[in-house]
Amino acid sequence: MNKTITALAIMMASFAANASVLPETPVPFKSGTGAIDNDTVYIGLGSAGTAWYKLDTQAKDKKWTALAAFPGGPRDQATSAFIDGNLYVFGGIGKNSEGLTQVFNDVHKYNPKTNSWVKLMSHAPMGMAGHVTFVHNGKAYVTGGVNQNIFNGYFEDLNEAGKDSTAIDKINAHYFDKKAEDYFFNKFLLSFDPSTQQWSYAGESPWYGTAGAAVVNKGDKTWLINGEAKPGLRTDAVFELDFTGNNLKWNKLAPVSSPDGVAGGFAGISNDSLIFAGGAGFKGSRENYQNGKNYAHEGLKKSYSTDIHLWHNGKWDKSGELSQGRAYGVSLPWNNSLLIIGGETAGGKAVTDSVLITVKDNKVTVQN
């Protein structure tokens, strides 16, 4: 069926009713990570636990195949990237040997030829959770994410509180009732060279770090879209990293999903059109924060966006809608489109389906 998007009265989005984009994931899948290499999609972790799966998108009989389990334990919010035929997995949130929830700063490598994992003797100089990862000129770049010490301390306090609800309420109030700058989200840009397994300083944002941003890159440019400015408070900011020439430049583009912004959204490119879709946030939190309420999302219900935005002539236009709001899935480039795998919908429910967003002549097509 075709559906005209009347908001802004500019563009049209059509919802394809034919066969599913990809087979359903083997388990409901959210808060995991994924990558694509030579038309083969790899997904894992998050609600899949330590499981990883692959799917050959060019196969006549498309199906998910289980891979060797991840050796680092179940993790949420890890990131991954393919470099020179190997899959690298960065950080994430999980439990340590003592059973405490913590942020990791380690790196694991998966070899598709041998279906085997190895933990590298390499540690990022800071924790990696809520961060983004992208590849440029054979290196992985990481930026954003929560502060490892603050985040780990929060969960240590919760562990000590046990089932004491009064203590838990006090810990939560103490944790959330701070200004954004007091969470020290990572604004550094780090590079990881797989040939040496060394981390290097590559620059830093002139503004602030975010957690749960959407990321997409093409050529010498990378875009970081929305994300958290602090726990429970999103931003509508859009940052552009330009690697053209010898000097990295940071640019701030027009905002999107204003005024509250979202985290866990999806970003991609189709026919040179920059796409941003979905995400989750708390409506009214930005106003609360501006009015001096640091615990900005207290009492607010998380909402899930259906909006699809396109970057056009220096601004964002709402150009389509998802069939339902979703966030915290995996977004990948495929068939000159944005492929979304899994995610969560209202109430935090993990899903198993995929969505393909294609843009042609400023017309958005959504295939479910």
UniProtKB/Swiss-Prot annotation:
UniProt key word Cell wall biogenesis/degradation: no
Active site positions, chain numbering: 228 (proton acceptor)
Catalyses which reaction(s): N-acetyl-alpha-neuraminate = N-acetyl-beta-neuraminate
Spans of repeat Kelch: 40-84, 86-137, 139-173, 174-219, 222-265, 287-336, 338-367
Keywords linked to the UniProt accession: Carbohydrate metabolism, Isomerase, Kelch repeat, Periplasm, Repeat, Signal
Impact reported for residue 302 to A: No effect on catalytic activity
EC number: 5.1.3.24
Biological processes annotated in GO: N-acetylneuraminate catabolic process
Induction note: Induced by N-acetylneuraminate and modulated by N-acetylglucosamine, via the NanR and NagC regulators.
GO molecular function annotations of the record: protein homodimerization activity; racemase and epimerase activity, acting on carbohydrates and derivatives
InterPro entries found in the cross-reference section: Kelch-typ_b-propeller (IPR015915), NANM (IPR056734), NanM_proteobact (IPR019936)
Signal peptide span: 1-19
Gene Ontology CC: outer membrane-bounded periplasmic space
Domain of life of the source: Bacteria
Localization per record: Periplasm
Outcome following mutation: residue 234 to A: Decrease in catalytic activity
NCBIfam families found in the cross-reference section: muta_rot_YjhT, PRK14131.1
Physiological role: Converts alpha-N-acetylneuranimic acid (Neu5Ac) to the beta-anomer, accelerating the equilibrium between the alpha- and beta-anomers. Probably facilitates sialidase-negative bacteria to compete successfully for limited amounts of extracellular Neu5Ac, which is likely taken up in the beta-anomer. In addition, the rapid removal of sialic acid from solution might be advantageous to the bacterium to damp down host responses. Forms linear aceneuramate during interconversion of Neu5Ac anomers.
Quaternary data: Homodimer.
Family: Belongs to the NanM family.
Protein name: N-acetylneuraminate epimerase
Upper lineage: Bacteria, Pseudomonadati, Pseudomonadota, Gammaproteobacteria, Enterobacterales
The gene coding this protein: nanM
